[in-house]
């Protein structure tokens, strides 16, 4: 059978093991071909090909429900649930999403882009099933990295208290998250990977007892209890934690042996309560480069399949904001041993891998544990350290209570560097960093800022570390502006002070962070239409530089705010509120992300769809303030676009 003919996972039923293994080869071939061309998550999906096939072989996917954690590992799922033909559009505008989306397929039962949610969601579905008197199976598939997340452990704690609720958790243990997992639980799982499978210990004991002459095939109840005791003697070396939490533990089993997994999943489905099947897989399985470098090939841009090397950009790009941050933090840490970098399993993505390599004793990876990362930093700050928590904007949402309760209220000097703030592109709505401006500006005692370029990022990092309270610094995804950088000697900025970049009399443009350069480009286009603009780099969201902004607004009389974040409660809202507080009635036009989700596309395509390119903003501004656009052909013909 060809993979291209597979439109429904139930078509796997009845195929021989040899046929299923052939399907597995075809999945890997298609997976590699598409990701090498358009980019995407590589290693996670390659590692669960056989697991997906074996699991679906034991389910009726017309009624049974499988929830995949995060979605990194769900590409094989997509390929056997009717998306083979469109898979070449992966992560492209209007194409197949990189994560699971309920709106994309009836087989995507729960959308996710953040880790550790699957067990809670699948358990909720099991609750609904039982309440409605239905009889289908509910399964969560979670990686060992995601299992270290507090939410997953909370769900296991709850599920284990429900002995009569049939519920299956499949632990995909590849000894990795995005980076190697950390912590005591990961160490425990690693030991379990190398232990004999528990259910087969128990089965072999029962088989041996059956063959005793005085038993004669049937095992009396008292002897059955003895075999259970033998199993419990083995469990402490393997699944003790899960057994003690109320789960029936099975495994570890080879996650690339389809036949054995089918038998194990079938046995798991026969158990009346919660079951955890521990499956040991290899991240990147079947592609030698991905197996050898499991961190580097977790996700890839387009690459050469033969060499495994990324296809170089047509033109050289400046270093990314993440890299500049990482390099600058290393320099600061070399001079101050009280500065500690903290990541929640995202060292490479945030640039903290540079600190990890250079000064490992000033680097902490807490695993997928954002809440713990924030309060750990708060504790450090209590006793004289200067922690720097580097975290994606979208993931800091998970620790909002800790920001308020543990850091803000106590005014502790913790620095947060929010990477991927703003539009992130192909990862879609679960990863867009569009909310941090709104959720940070209301937290007590915080100073919140964003740089216009990578040189200003360096100065802001120093500013944060010299401040005596909590600070948040947002940086966008991707390359910087290409400005000259200093190796050391960065001067801190004055808190709450912006700067004027352009002077004009017709319009005041207030821009924040990554939208400062597009604002300058927008002003240049307006200038060609005879409209002169004052452009202000706000620098600080909290406190806002009212001493600079208010007199300019009074004098000029027309204001535009530009931000790469949600308009609701955002930078523009802060400006309008400051005007209102001072009874300053000035027309203000806010440009940013409206009340909508930003779907997967390239960053440039997303900005175009939101009207946030300089030519689009120029046209919108002229229309808003009644300036004639009929002769402004430059607005539609201009090639100027935001970076």
Curated annotation (Swiss-Prot):
<dbReference type="GO" id="GO:0016114">
    <property type="term" value="P:terpenoid biosynthetic process"/>
</dbReference>
<feature type="binding site">
    <location>
        <position position="144"/>
    </location>
    <ligand>
        <name>Mg(2+)</name>
    </ligand>
</feature>
<dbReference type="GO" id="GO:0009228">
    <property type="term" value="P:thiamine biosynthetic process"/>
</dbReference>
<dbReference type="InterPro" id="IPR020826">
    <property type="entry name" value="Transketolase_BS"/>
</dbReference>
<keyword id="KW-0479">Metal-binding</keyword>
<dbReference type="GO" id="GO:0008661">
    <property type="term" value="F:1-deoxy-D-xylulose-5-phosphate synthase activity"/>
</dbReference>
<dbReference type="GO" id="GO:0052865">
    <property type="term" value="P:1-deoxy-D-xylulose 5-phosphate biosynthetic process"/>
</dbReference>
<dbReference type="InterPro" id="IPR049557">
    <property type="entry name" value="Transketolase_CS"/>
</dbReference>
<dbReference type="GO" id="GO:0030976">
    <property type="term" value="F:thiamine pyrophosphate binding"/>
</dbReference>
<comment type="similarity">
    <text>Belongs to the transketolase family. DXPS subfamily.</text>
</comment>
<dbReference type="GO" id="GO:0000287">
    <property type="term" value="F:magnesium ion binding"/>
</dbReference>
<keyword id="KW-0786">Thiamine pyrophosphate</keyword>
<dbReference type="InterPro" id="IPR029061">
    <property type="entry name" value="THDP-binding"/>
</dbReference>
<feature type="binding site">
    <location>
        <begin position="145"/>
        <end position="146"/>
    </location>
    <ligand>
        <name>thiamine diphosphate</name>
    </ligand>
</feature>
<dbReference type="InterPro" id="IPR005475">
    <property type="entry name" value="Transketolase-like_Pyr-bd"/>
</dbReference>
<dbReference type="InterPro" id="IPR033248">
    <property type="entry name" value="Transketolase_C"/>
</dbReference>
<comment type="pathway">
    <text>Metabolic intermediate biosynthesis; 1-deoxy-D-xylulose 5-phosphate biosynthesis; 1-deoxy-D-xylulose 5-phosphate from D-glyceraldehyde 3-phosphate and pyruvate: step 1/1.</text>
</comment>
<dbReference type="Pfam" id="PF02779">
    <property type="entry name" value="Transket_pyr"/>
</dbReference>
<dbReference type="Pfam" id="PF02780">
    <property type="entry name" value="Transketolase_C"/>
</dbReference>
<feature type="binding site">
    <location>
        <position position="72"/>
    </location>
    <ligand>
        <name>thiamine diphosphate</name>
    </ligand>
</feature>
<keyword id="KW-0414">Isoprene biosynthesis</keyword>
<keyword id="KW-0808">Transferase</keyword>
<dbReference type="GO" id="GO:0005829">
    <property type="term" value="C:cytosol"/>
</dbReference>
<dbReference type="InterPro" id="IPR005477">
    <property type="entry name" value="Dxylulose-5-P_synthase"/>
</dbReference>
<feature type="binding site">
    <location>
        <begin position="113"/>
        <end position="115"/>
    </location>
    <ligand>
        <name>thiamine diphosphate</name>
    </ligand>
</feature>
<dbReference type="GO" id="GO:0019288">
    <property type="term" value="P:isopentenyl diphosphate biosynthetic process, methylerythritol 4-phosphate pathway"/>
</dbReference>
<feature type="binding site">
    <location>
        <position position="174"/>
    </location>
    <ligand>
        <name>thiamine diphosphate</name>
    </ligand>
</feature>
<keyword id="KW-0784">Thiamine biosynthesis</keyword>
<protein>
    <recommendedName>
        <fullName>1-deoxy-D-xylulose-5-phosphate synthase</fullName>
        <ecNumber>2.2.1.7</ecNumber>
    </recommendedName>
</protein>
<dbReference type="InterPro" id="IPR009014">
    <property type="entry name" value="Transketo_C/PFOR_II"/>
</dbReference>
<dbReference type="Pfam" id="PF13292">
    <property type="entry name" value="DXP_synthase_N"/>
</dbReference>
<feature type="binding site">
    <location>
        <position position="370"/>
    </location>
    <ligand>
        <name>thiamine diphosphate</name>
    </ligand>
</feature>
<comment type="subunit">
    <text>Homodimer.</text>
</comment>
<feature type="binding site">
    <location>
        <position position="287"/>
    </location>
    <ligand>
        <name>thiamine diphosphate</name>
    </ligand>
</feature>
<comment type="function">
    <text>Catalyzes the acyloin condensation reaction between C atoms 2 and 3 of pyruvate and glyceraldehyde 3-phosphate to yield 1-deoxy-D-xylulose-5-phosphate (DXP).</text>
</comment>
<keyword id="KW-0460">Magnesium</keyword>
<feature type="binding site">
    <location>
        <position position="174"/>
    </location>
    <ligand>
        <name>Mg(2+)</name>
    </ligand>
</feature>
